């Protein structure tokens, strides 16, 4: 009897975790993500260190973000984003091979994995977090569209000290809106994503400027995102032609 109670508690905890995690993923399929664990952690760190707490974040829908920004982050972070199932096995194998001889290990996290980490987990790397990251990545790839994953990613990712998401970055770094970000500005933002605290997209270092140039070139090779629905586009063209005939 003594053994049954702990097992029952453990079973209930596991059941609660699965139900609540699936519920949270379904919830965020439709509802904007206004706060993330990283935002809270960074704010607490600032408070503890005696700094002024800065947390700039404004959610905007995907169609209010410059189309160049998803192209830039795909070119920089995850060029197979539109086609993989959340995990880029080609990059994972490359990273594993390179890490055999490298002191500084390189990762192979996809945009989907980064989104799962940003929205549901904590930033410190560990095998436990990686395990949860795989689980949540599978869930969002199953429950969300690629466009929704990108929308959440561009609205939640850290893009500067106390700055999160495309709209806040556009406002505080470039004095504009997310919709009006230029191609060059989007490439600068993408160039700083590996370390947005160290690198500043508004005042780029020579290294970031070189990365910007590389990303701009790669953007020409990346397929348009989100992919154009041929049937939908055909229907819109037909509608436009009919409207023109009516006007005549």
Swiss-Prot record:
Gene Ontology annotations of biological process type: cell wall organization; peptidoglycan biosynthetic process; regulation of cell shape
Signal peptide start and end residues: none
- Primary residence: membrane
In the bilayer, the protein is annotated as:
Single-pass membrane protein
Which parts of the chain span the membrane according to its record?
Answer: 13-33
EC class, as a word, reads transferase
Return the annotated region ranges for Disordered. Answer: 226-248
UniProt GO MF annotations: pentosyltransferase activity; peptidoglycan glycosyltransferase activity
Known EC number(s)? 2.4.99.28
The biased composition feature labelled Basic and acidic residues covers 227-240
Pfam families (alphabetical): Transgly
Pathway(s) of this molecule:
Cell wall biogenesis; peptidoglycan biosynthesis
Question: Sorted alphabetically, which keywords does the UniProt record give?
Answer: Cell inner membrane, Cell membrane, Cell shape, Cell wall biogenesis/degradation, Glycosyltransferase, Membrane, Peptidoglycan synthesis, Transferase, Transmembrane, Transmembrane helix
Provide the Gene Ontology terms for cellular component: peptidoglycan-based cell wall; plasma membrane
Q: Which reaction does it catalyse?
A: [GlcNAc-(1->4)-Mur2Ac(oyl-L-Ala-gamma-D-Glu-L-Lys-D-Ala-D-Ala)](n)-di-trans,octa-cis-undecaprenyl diphosphate + beta-D-GlcNAc-(1->4)-Mur2Ac(oyl-L-Ala-gamma-D-Glu-L-Lys-D-Ala-D-Ala)-di-trans,octa-cis-undecaprenyl diphosphate = [GlcNAc-(1->4)-Mur2Ac(oyl-L-Ala-gamma-D-Glu-L-Lys-D-Ala-D-Ala)](n+1)-di-trans,octa-cis-undecaprenyl diphosphate + di-trans,octa-cis-undecaprenyl diphosphate + H(+)
Q: Which domain of life is it from?
A: Bacteria
Location of the protein in the cell: Cell inner membrane
Q: What does this protein do?
A: Peptidoglycan polymerase that catalyzes glycan chain elongation from lipid-linked precursors.
Tell me its family.
Belongs to the glycosyltransferase 51 family.
Q: Which PANTHER family match?
A: BIOSYNTHETIC PEPTIDOGLYCAN TRANSGLYCOSYLASE (PTHR30400:SF0), MONOFUNCTIONAL BIOSYNTHETIC PEPTIDOGLYCAN TRANSGLYCOSYLASE (PTHR30400)
What protein name does the entry list? Biosynthetic peptidoglycan transglycosylase
Provenance organism: Bacteroides fragilis (strain ATCC 25285 / DSM 2151 / CCUG 4856 / JCM 11019 / LMG 10263 / NCTC 9343 / Onslow / VPI 2553 / EN-2)
Q: What is the lineage of its organism?
A: Bacteria, Pseudomonadati, Bacteroidota, Bacteroidia, Bacteroidales
Gene name per UniProt: mtgA
């Amino acid at each position: 009897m003594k053994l049954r109670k702990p097992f029952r508690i453990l079973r209930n905890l596991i059941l609660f975790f699965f139900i609540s995690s699936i519920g949270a993923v379904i919830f965020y399929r439709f509802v904007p993500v206004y706060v993330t664990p990283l935002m809270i952690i960074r704010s607490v760190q600032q408070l503890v260190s005696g700094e002024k707490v800065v947390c700039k974040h404004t959610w905007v829908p995907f169609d209010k973000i410059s189309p160049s920004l998803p192209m830039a982050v795909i070119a920089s972070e995850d060029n197979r984003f539109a086609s993989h199932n959340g995990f880029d096995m080609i990059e994972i194998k490359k990273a594993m091979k390179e890490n055999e001889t490298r002191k500084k290990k390189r990762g192979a996290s996809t945009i989907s994995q980064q989104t799962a980490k940003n929205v549901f987990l904590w930033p410190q790397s560990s095998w436990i977090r990686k395990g949860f990251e795989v689980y949540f990545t599978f869930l969002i790839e199953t429950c969300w569209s690629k466009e929704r994953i990108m929308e959440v990613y561009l609205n939640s990712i850290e893009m500067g000290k106390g700055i999160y998401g495309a709209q806040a970055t556009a406002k505080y770094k470039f004095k504009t809106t997310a919709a009006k970000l230029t191609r060059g500005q989007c490439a600068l933002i993408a160039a700083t994503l590996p370390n947005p605290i160290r690198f500043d997209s508004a005042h780029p270092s020579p290294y970031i400027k070189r990365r910007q140039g590389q990303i701009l070139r790669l953007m020409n090779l990346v397929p348009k995102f989100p992919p154009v629905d041929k049937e939908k586009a055909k229907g819109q063209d037909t509608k436009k032609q009919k409207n023109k005939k009516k006007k005549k």
